[in-house]
Amino acid sequence: MGDKEKKPLKYRILTYGCQMNVRDSETIAGLLEGSGFNQAEDLSEADLIVFNTCSVRHSAENKVYGKLGEIASLKKKRPELLIAFGGCMAQLPEVRQKLKKRGVDVVFGTHNIHELPYLIARAKEKRSPVFEVWEKEGSIVEPLPSCRKPGLSAFVNIMFGCNNFCSYCIVPYTRGRERSRKADDIIRELEELAAAGYKEVTLLGQNVNSYGRGLGEKIEFADLLYRANSVAGIERIRFTTSHPKDVSDRLLQAIAECEKLCEHIHAPLQAGSNRILQRMNRNYSREHYLKLVERMRHYVPGVSITSDLIVGFPGETEEDFLETLDMVERVRFDAAFTFLYSQRSGTRAAELAEQIPLEEKKQRLERLNRRQYQIATEINQELQGSIQEVLVEGPSKTNPQKLTSRTRSNRIVIFSGGKDLIGRLINVKITEAKTFSLFGEIFNE
């Protein structure tokens, strides 16, 4: 056997979508490295390219297909190149049908990531494509290897799937029903992260408030937070996402009492009109949401509240849209992720009449963003002169001569300082505020 053949194969993972996919890609990397692969510096030297995909919006799918076209032309020059395709798009039958003509060697789903090394070996042995996607979720497989990038912050899954079936959302169909990880497994992972030098963790779930249901033991999300708060070495804890319909007082009390829990709650409103909320199957009203905001600010003074907002949902009138703008005024979100409604085949909303023209959706999005950005700027300006505790993350991407850091309320703060501060919690005085970031200077009492 020649020297060339002895070299380990190299892989590259292309990740699209949410934090759940980022975490899945870390697991995929761990599985591949456990099978003898090494990570490639770039696509040109990879023997295996893995797509970990998102199907929440058409734009995400279009990016994937565009990149897949690029890789297919690369494969014509290098026929031995293997392409694996996973993530939420792989769960959709119509996508799998398209992939049969795209030069893909392995297709795997969200429920059988752990099988990837075996599927790759099968494809190489058969010299023909292997499509293996589980339609139904199985039991959670623990433990799985992981290959996280060195750093300060880490994502930790606490549950998988979703039972809410919002009418616009494909996630319950691609991620399956809710399954919670055992609390002991989660705490063990947090302890391992602390031992590896991570300072901050973000607990992930489609709806973290549902954590514990179906576990067979009496535990809810607040109980898990109290346990996580006691893990030595972890200095900050975040979580996402919270469904507004079931944020309990006990959860809010846990945020108030646990010193490591950051004062930031992402509670997606999605729309401000009760009629549209009902069509979305969100199971709460604008009045419920406003009371929730009152409760959040009562239990956690100064809490940062962020949201997702969708414009152009089928049947949304100008009056419905104005109600969303009104909620933005009333709540005054610290930040909001805003989206055009994206019609997803297989969801109930896709079958609704009165689909809104694209140009009208874009105009509404522009109006919404304009006002939300003004509010975010105003809130940030109120922080000028304040002292904020920040976790120093590293050199700023926009100005490597400065450091970037993050407040407990999840705001970016740029300041001047030495690299010895990276990884530390320090106090910074805010000197300037913009829409998406703050600027400051080290504060020494």
Curated annotation (Swiss-Prot):
Keywords per UniProt: 4Fe-4S, Cytoplasm, Iron, Iron-sulfur, Metal-binding, S-adenosyl-L-methionine, Transferase, tRNA processing
CDD domains associated with the record: Radical_SAM
Residue span, TRAM domain: 381-444
GO CC annotations, alphabetized: cytosol
SUPFAM superfamilies linked: Radical SAM enzymes (SSF102114)
Enzyme class: transferase
Sections of the chain in a coiled coil: none
Chain positions recorded as [4Fe-4S] cluster 2 binding sites: 162, 166, 169
Catalysed reaction equations from the record: N(6)-dimethylallyladenosine(37) in tRNA + (sulfur carrier)-SH + AH2 + 2 S-adenosyl-L-methionine = 2-methylsulfanyl-N(6)-dimethylallyladenosine(37) in tRNA + (sulfur carrier)-H + 5'-deoxyadenosine + L-methionine + A + S-adenosyl-L-homocysteine + 2 H(+)
Positions that bind [4Fe-4S] cluster 1: 18, 54, 88
Subcellular compartments: Cytoplasm
Molecular function, one GO term: metal ion binding
Cofactor dependence: [4Fe-4S] cluster
Known EC number: 2.8.4.3
Pfam families tied to this protein: Radical_SAM, TRAM, UPF0004
Family statement: Belongs to the methylthiotransferase family. MiaB subfamily.
Assembly with partners or alone: Monomer.
General function of this protein: Catalyzes the methylthiolation of N6-(dimethylallyl)adenosine (i(6)A), leading to the formation of 2-methylthio-N6-(dimethylallyl)adenosine (ms(2)i(6)A) at position 37 in tRNAs that read codons beginning with uridine.
UniProt name for this protein: tRNA-2-methylthio-N(6)-dimethylallyladenosine synthase
Gene: miaB
